[in-house]
Amino acid sequence: MKPATVSPIKIARRGLMLVISSPSGAGKSTIARNLLEADPDLSISVSVTTRSRRPSEIEGRHYFFKSIREFEALRATDSLLEWAEVHGNYYGTPRDAVEKAMGEGRDMLFDIDWQGAQQLQEKMAGDVVSIFILPPSMAELQSRLHRRAEDSEEVIATRLANSRAEIEHWREYDYIVVNDDLDRAFSSVRAIVEAERLRRDRRPGLFEFVNGLLTENPL
């Protein structure tokens, strides 16, 4: 006889905003993609950008690709929760989608740089959990950028030149993960997410649940 299936107890909690940043080539996008595939309770915040679309990228899935004029219109109407200029291109987070998700208690992942992370921390500090991904070495970072084979030598040189300045902001993040092994780094990030979901201050439903326990009479 099979044992009865016990349904998980649902305790209301606030959604969290998971911010993952790193210099180009350190692995944040791969870790973010793997996390989304493994965790059905997490959805991606799709950024808008003025950067040219890469061959492997899909409109609306990886980014919303905009002209500079379209991007400036979004900024002017306060339609972006945060925005930044990175490697000569603009990136931003659409406000409406994030506010809707937080209102419904859903978790969202943000694959953004340190400038965007700063703005989110300033505006929604209680909801943000930030993780910075470091490469094991600068030599390995350069090797990964070349292996990716999606950028020109000029673009790779620019990204490497900017990476040191980006790494300088590591102290501003809640957690630091060194990506010397992708599986190990992914496991570390996933453990962080699970722990943050269990924080008492993220779970207002605990008050009702605990009060119910204390008033329960099993006899």
UniProtKB/Swiss-Prot annotation:
Name of protein: Guanylate kinase
InterPro entries according to UniProt: GK/Ca_channel_bsu (IPR008145), Guanylate_kin-like_dom (IPR008144), Guanylate_kinase (IPR017665), Guanylate_kinase_CS (IPR020590), P-loop_NTPase (IPR027417)
Known function: Essential for recycling GMP and indirectly, cGMP.
SUPFAM superfamilies in the cross-refs: P-loop containing nucleoside triphosphate hydrolases
GO cellular component, one term: cytosol
Primary site of residence: cytoplasm
Top-level taxonomy: Bacteria, Pseudomonadati, Pseudomonadota, Alphaproteobacteria, Hyphomicrobiales
Keywords of this entry: ATP-binding, Cytoplasm, Kinase, Nucleotide-binding, Transferase
Guanylate kinase-like domain mapped to chain residues: 15-194
Keyword DNA repair: no
Family statement: Belongs to the guanylate kinase family.
EC number: 2.7.4.8
A GO MF label: guanylate kinase activity
Matching PANTHER family: GUANYLATE KINASE, GUANYLATE KINASE-RELATED
Ligand binding (ATP): S22, P23, S24, G25, A26, G27, K28, S29
Cellular compartments annotated: Cytoplasm
Catalytic activity: GMP + ATP = GDP + ADP
